[in-house]
Amino acid sequence: MKKPYSIGLDIGTNSVGWAVVTDDYKVPAKKMKVLGNTDKSHIEKNLLGALLFDSGNTAEDRRLKRTARRRYTRRRNRILYLQEIFSEEMGKVDDSFFHRLEDSFLVTEDKRGERHPIFGNLEEEVKYHENFPTIYHLRQYLADNPEKVDLRLVYLALAHIIKFRGHFLIEGKFDTRNNDVQRLFQEFLAVYDNTFENSSLQEQNVQVEEILTDKISKSAKKDRVLKLFPNEKSNGRFAEFLKLIVGNQADFKKHFELEEKAPLQFSKDTYEEELEVLLAQIGDNYAELFLSAKKLYDSILLSGILTVTDVGTKAPLSASMIQRYNEHQMDLAQLKQFIRQKLSDKYNEVFSDVSKDGYAGYIDGKTNQEAFYKYLKGLLNKIEGSGYFLDKIEREDFLRKQRTFDNGSIPHQIHLQEMRAIIRRQAEFYPFLADNQDRIEKLLTFRIPYYVGPLARGKSDFAWLSRKSADKITPWNFDEIVDKESSAEAFINRMTNYDLYLPNQKVLPKHSLLYEKFTVYNELTKVKYKTEQGKTAFFDANMKQEIFDGVFKVYRKVTKDKLMDFLEKEFDEFRIVDLTGLDKENKVFNASYGTYHDLCKILDKDFLDNSKNEKILEDIVLTLTLFEDREMIRKRLENYSDLLTKEQVKKLERRHYTGWGRLSAELIHGIRNKESRKTILDYLIDDGNSNRNFMQLINDDALSFKEEIAKAQVIGETDNLNQVVSDIAGSPAIKKGILQSLKIVDELVKIMGHQPENIVVEMARENQFTNQGRRNSQQRLKGLTDSIKEFGSQILKEHPVENSQLQNDRLFLYYLQNGRDMYTGEELDIDYLSQYDIDHIIPQAFIKDNSIDNRVLTSSKENRGKSDDVPSKDVVRKMKSYWSKLLSAKLITQRKFDNLTKAERGGLTDDDKAGFIKRQLVETRQITKHVARILDERFNTETDENNKKIRQVKIVTLKSNLVSNFRKEFELYKVREINDYHHAHDAYLNAVIGKALLGVYPQLEPEFVYGDYPHFHGHKENKATAKKFFYSNIMNFFKKDDVRTDKNGEIIWKKDEHISNIKKVLSYPQVNIVKKVEEQTGGFSKESILPKGNSDKLIPRKTKKFYWDTKKYGGFDSPIVAYSILVIADIEKGKSKKLKTVKALVGVTIMEKMTFERDPVAFLERKGYRNVQEENIIKLPKYSLFKLENGRKRLLASARELQKGNEIVLPNHLGTLLYHAKNIHKVDEPKHLDYVDKHKDEFKELLDVVSNFSKKYTLAEGNLEKIKELYAQNNGEDLKELASSFINLLTFTAIGAPATFKFFDKNIDRKRYTSTTEILNATLIHQSITGLYETRIDLNKLGGD
């Protein structure tokens, strides 16, 4: 008979733990066959293990490289097109001119002709450089001089303009005499006022252009502009934005209440990434503000570049650059003279030493302008007479180069103006320039619209181009060959993501009116008002509608005060005194109907409010989100030419939105509940007395939304696992974990020979970058100070406290309770806090809620009354008025107050308890549901006569806190640092808990088993059933001694026996840990180009048309190895070149991979091997496993390096010691420190275990001796240092790459294994994904007969 079993999975982003569990919570062992050429034929293995792998990465790096390649290719193409236009005429003047230019990079012996690139002779070349020291001298000369000039010089000037053509951020015409600093400042103020509540800077109408374009320091500019706004503080938010705008570094930590610094500076290369990180914390709605600040900054920069006021020149940019050049020359002469006189001993360092940040380093290119200025300031600061230099440095106008970071602020129109001037002058002498003027200008002005994408011919994964013809695309025929409209449609389809819940529906733009309306109602539906009588209630449908029309349509940002004013006017009879449920910190709604306010400035209000126009408005916002290109916006808005005026279209063109929502129109306002025919938005607007929000509506079993979503998520073919997993929404890292877990399940089912009863899944949460939780704890003191002040207490004056100390919850609760016992009102003594109890308002018997909201400080838990319910009525009667004061001062939340006073409303009801059950059990994360769905569809394929699924395999999803609670309860401590077994143990405990819960509470099955079951309602069941388990935390049965059986009398849980089994499994020394072998992909080598030298190790930068010898041109080093190969072949030895058979490891780089795979034998012969036979080549990807003497294992890192391959196993008591050592810093839990103190002698035993392990497997004798000496010198005086040192010591024994660690504050350097010779005669172990199947190859036996 087939024995039933369950599979447990613990899925993470770089590991998957797995376990097979039988009915009595044991893990079976199987005798597994071993293939290969060793004496081992079978090994008994426990069906318990973990797969470790490098986590999946996003495609960002690949994308950045791809776009850079395209940019350079297109730039090169522009130059080739220009040469094509010039070629015929240039042939008459100098037919080898273009060849010489192309060869200018090459060393003399590699050139095809003369070594002087422009004129081909030294004399003319020298004269040219004297006349035109920079290209800008030539550009101005050609633009302003009416005489005929050598055609070669005309080409050089135009090629420079076309190569570095400026940015395209400004559309249409651009006046170089007026670059709009004032207008852009006004635009910035408008966005600023829109973004921040109660800001009206725009109204002050100040003139700033003169200040911002003046030659004064950045700080002076900021200060002068700030003075024009008398109400703005010098350390305020507006001042911080001014810092940014003038080009200084700003830090928004304080202004957005962030935990860490948030520095931003427009001139930094990392600006884009730093802004992205900031917006991830504060919200995308600030993106437009930073964009308008950046436009203003660029415009100020440009005014600093275009410094020439000479109206006569037709080349203002070139003239400004010449002025910069001349100033540089004069200032350099002055600086040299000054340093000779005042600092003669420093002269050589400044002007000759390239390694320093002086002038030599600056001109060489190693030192940037910022570092050079810093160096000079340090040198000149206290020297008399250096004021001139320091003043220019302060203005950032000293010894400036021609090519600097701020050249990025030059619009292409300025270059175009110079190009036209040059062509106009020279076309008189070269008519072909006039004939081809449009084509030449097009080379400068034409850009491939981003919505057309790459111009590939159907061979690229990244192209979506639609063509009208197969001809080659050039800047001049683009509109004839490319179907822009179809390409734009395809772009829309690629750009928009799919809904998380309805995977075949596209999401709405973030600024869609429908989406914004949804977010407003979703937030509003959970806001409660409080009346004078102390009654609290949700807003009804009528009030919500009135608030939406009267507040959200009137104010862009809705604050608590604005809503209160409205309610006082419109709902005076309700006597509303307070609101709860808003963002506590800022007292504002996070949601806004902002797009409505934007469109109100352009379109008629009646048009916006007319429901018939909803579709049109959604399409307009979609267009404004997808396209920045005004021409395309105009084209798409032509569909509404009968509704929109030309003026309105013009205004809409300038409006651009960014960002996407996460939900589709179909989900929000498409699918309807079967009975009521209402959509989700309809329910948010009017939900009777329930006032459910979005998450509650889609998870409510009484409505059909849940069923509709489940139906929409059914996947088709499940055989192609890669496709199935790639289609779900989630990061590459978590998808990689999911894919591996599905493969593991397949292998386990194959080994067991039949399907499991249950598959229990738990998924790790990814580290998402959210500041909310951390910000809350970081801001404890700030919030406390305000509330204590409101409460009218002196407690903070009497007992001052630092924010860091408030991380101790006991102390924090003391202040939140104003130093009094929460249940008696008596004073507590701050010096004896450790003797008081922390009590859970809702007992832990029902739910593990350790939040501040569920805990109070009391002199004794007895003070609460009954221990199995909320605090008693007597306590409530006595303390309610005190609690109310705490609530008014915001020292406690409404939720805490409601729970404290619950007894007067009958205490905990059955419904409450049903809710607790759900919160503990029901995994709400969508990604986990996706995994459950995939497993369900792979294993449960049969249906009954009613077409209902027959679920033979139950897919159980568990919340991760169930396992951690279970571990704590039975002291099954987890210390990740010891080894990787904890992944397997978590999977095992998941299976245990899932299996036991299913047995003990079959009626709870629908809550955590995937599928369409009738759901359980606590209050609808008969009272006896409800009582049976509802009066407890669902995990409590594990602790009780009574035996639990199922309806057939089978034992499900027998505490002593089963806990004993569990402990036994967790102490198994044999757990199958597999490090996934992976072929390396990506770049060929490190990216730095190294200078030429005699090294043979350099890789040439070019090999195709022309070979760039690394001895002449330098090259790359550190090629990335795709995989290694073990080869047995002959090599020639000694002078006689006698053949000798060798066994060797050869690294195959990513660059060589294709050559090797095409013909391995020829590849190795080129490397000097002879008599190579394919059967004597073994491919070894990274992390291949080798076994050596005494069970020592090594992983292959590369052909030249190994890593550690053994896992240390510790006895239970040492695991317990390390658990407490790891948590010793927790002030709230003194038991950890006590335990370590009592058992500190066990660290000696731990060191012995590590020492024995190290001698056998790690083999780092020097390090081991150093560790022992340090332990002897520091024998446990400082317990915290002792504890952290031994946690760090586990790095020494950990599997994988060796790493440096600290032991008693001294660095223990890593011991690298840089010889791979020892594995050539070891046993190679090929493992399957679970490690249960193995092929062992004794490399000693290879290569013989």
UniProtKB/Swiss-Prot annotation:
Active-site residues from the entry: D10, H840
Coiled coil: none
Keywords, sorted A to Z: Antiviral defense, DNA-binding, Endonuclease, Hydrolase, Magnesium, Manganese, Metal-binding, Nuclease, RNA-binding
PROSITE patterns (alphabetical): HNH_CAS9 (PS51749)
Binding-site residues, Mg(2+) 2: D10, E766, H983
UniProt-listed InterPro entries: Cas9, Cas9-BH, Cas9_PI, Cas9_REC, Cas9_RuvC, HNH_CAS9, HNH_nuc, RNaseH_sf
Broad enzyme group: hydrolase
Applications reported: The simplicity of the Cas9-gRNAs RNA-directed DNA endonuclease activity may be used to target and modify a DNA sequence of interest.
Cofactor: Mg(2+)
GO MF assignments: DNA binding; endonuclease activity; metal ion binding; RNA binding
Residues that coordinate or bind Mg(2+) 1: D10, E762, E766
Family: Belongs to the CRISPR-associated protein Cas9 family. Subtype II-A subfamily.
Subunit structure: Monomer. Binds crRNA and tracrRNA.
UniProt comment concerning the protein's domains: Has 2 endonuclease domains. The discontinuous RuvC-like domain cleaves the target DNA noncomplementary to crRNA while the HNH nuclease domain cleaves the target DNA complementary to crRNA.
Function: CRISPR (clustered regularly interspaced short palindromic repeat) is an adaptive immune system that provides protection against mobile genetic elements (viruses, transposable elements and conjugative plasmids). CRISPR clusters contain spacers, sequences complementary to antecedent mobile elements, and target invading nucleic acids. CRISPR clusters are transcribed and processed into CRISPR RNA (crRNA). In type II CRISPR systems correct processing of pre-crRNA requires a trans-encoded small RNA (tracrRNA), endogenous ribonuclease 3 (rnc) and this protein.
Name of this protein: CRISPR-associated endonuclease Cas9
